[in-house]
Amino acid sequence: MSIQEAPPPAEFAVDKSYLYKFQRFSAWSGFLVMAVQGGCFFMLSKVQPPLDPQSTADQVKEWMIDNRAGILWTTVICSFVIPLEYFFVVTTSWQMRRIERGWGVLTMNQVLMGVVAPIGFFYPMFILSAAAYRVEERSPEILQLMTDIFYFSYVGFAFIFCLQCVCLGWATLIDKRTEPVFPRWFAYVNFMLAIVLAPGAFIYLFKDGPLAWNGLFAFWLPCLAYAVWKISTPLLLLKAVDSEEQEAAENQLPVLV
């Protein structure tokens, strides 16, 4: 069920060229966020690959001293780049709205879950930056505690987005138009990501093995699946924008706001 909207008067229609340019920029912002966040986390701050959960407090402090500058600069850079994720989320939701022909349940869930998404990057880095800021003055045990909180909130937080993936996949399957907004295989990519993210909920119980925060099921498979999703989704959004523009031109449809 969705809220049906009547076409607005011509004077309230949005300039279509502006809308499509904005959506294309928003789709590309998904690539930018992934590239910058991945580069910062893997190469600058070196929080990925994750530390061994069984590292001693002294080992954690030594690691943090060695990577202090990278951790703090990662937070600075991400503060400028991660907000672009909202553009990506909004455009994804807009295209889902085409499927439901209004602000339906699936679209609204996508919007709300998408609002939470940047917090999954920001909040953990704030915690780690607070630890690294005065790293020389902190006891190893405090630094170990804050590192635990970082990985719990970063790796474990990903499980929350299972619902977002399910909603996007479901919307893709219910699209019965001749030329669907998203191809059918994209639904299964989303369902796969939802399944792969689920083991992240178990990291609080394990310090080693595939379900630890550096394990195969809790980190590496979700990381790979997320990369596939984050590459395919912007590409499909660009195609969806093209189809929307063509559809509007053929039918001379106003853009609903």
How would you describe each model-predicted region?
Residues 2-257:
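Hydrophobic, aromatic-enriched alpha-helical segments typical of multi-pass transmembrane helices
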